[in-house]
Amino acid sequence: MPRPFPRPRLRSTAAVFTTMSALAATSLITGPSAAEPFSAAACALTRTEAHHSEGVDTWNAAYPQPTRTLDAVMVFLSFPDATPRTTPDQLAADHFPATSRFFEQASYGRFTLRPHPLRNWIRMPRPSTSYVIERDWSASHRADYLRDALAAADGQVDFSRYDVVYFVADPDAPGVDSDATKVVNLDTPMRADGTDIRRVVTVFEQHPPDRLVLAHETGHVFDLPDLYHRPVDGKGDWDTYVGDWDLMGSQFGLAPDLFGWHKWKLGWLDPRQVTCVGKPTRLTLEPLGAGPGTPVAGRPAFGLGRGTKLAVVRTGPETALAFEARSPAGNDAGTCKEGVLVYRVRAGAASGGGPIQVIDAHPHTEACWEASVYPPLADAPVALGESFTVPGDDVRVEVEGRTVAGAWTVKITP
């Protein structure tokens, strides 16, 4: 997961051009508009062979689907070349209940991640420096680390009881690199207690850790891709694809709730909460972060949670445009700007290759410089009273009003 780098103040000359115009209909309205009754399946992109493909037509059975309670074991690893200065309880508290709370809110209560942290350190057989831990870890050193960790823990852990495995290293050991935290996917699974272990989250975070870092890595366990852009030389801005708008882009984002597309993929949205738009359509979009009873920007906490969360326009065999409302609610409580967010989805793009890219409705301005991970996209949503035509696709969205509960009324014209 990337750490923040200095951000350039100048906008890229490659910024997209938009057409903005004010709308007259900005008053509150009390009820939803009629949505075009197209089946969500008509806009469900097909899952491809790309790593962590954004296809939503089927679930990849190689990954656990987070639509029930899943159990996660946290194994704390110490090394002969260091005496831990923290306790397993302290490290567990770095990540829980924050990680479970994030997923509870993101899933509208449909998924619970239940942690099972060990209460003691488990000693690795070799010094931390011998594993040459780093971000771009060599396969041989990584294999040594995982093999030793599994062998050391197997006497104390029944791995057959758990859906997710976290190996948490002593953050103060000299060979531990906090930039190396990641999910390791194994072509040949490790075997313990009669069960295959196909992926492990290797945690090397400092104490205290980066915000929501474990939630980001756990997203990979559920087949979600990296949405950040990694510069070839390691320098420059990592957040040009999605900015603050999804945890899989940055765990530091102001609005880190998972995209509606990801909630659809994970099984947290009912088909009726996704509208496939094939002709001019008026509909009401609930704020993505609002579950049943969740207040939205001080508005009453009623009437939201089970309505439409995502509108989709199919643009090609492997591409689509997605529209969702982002307001200060739930995991998005700290959002910089609210409105209707527009983004492109590419099912054929692999993790890290831009499978989702936010489209900036205000390409000549930026916002929240002091807090945003990428200010040029912090004001990307189409605001109340604005219209926006998506460059290259000629799809227009008009944000016409708000309901008393805080939902957004929009018209989408493909």
Regions found by a protein language model. Give the residues of each.
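Zn2+-dependent metallopeptidase catalytic core
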Residues: 36-207, 215, 233, 387-388, ...
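Active-site-proximal beta-strand/loop segments in catalytic clefts of secreted hydrolases
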Residues: 75-80, 168-172, 224-227, 249-253, ...
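Secretory targeting and sorting signals
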Residues: 1-35
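Non-catalytic C-terminal accessory/binding modules of secreted extracellular proteins
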Residues: 3, 44-56, 187-204, 286-414
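Short, polar loop/linker segments at the starts of domains and inter-domain junctions
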Residues: 85-97, 258-265, 337, 357-358
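Short, solvent-exposed loop/turn elements at domain surfaces
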Residues: 81-86, 255-259, 331-333, 351
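Extracellular hydrolytic enzyme modules, especially secreted metalloproteases
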Residues: 159, 172-331
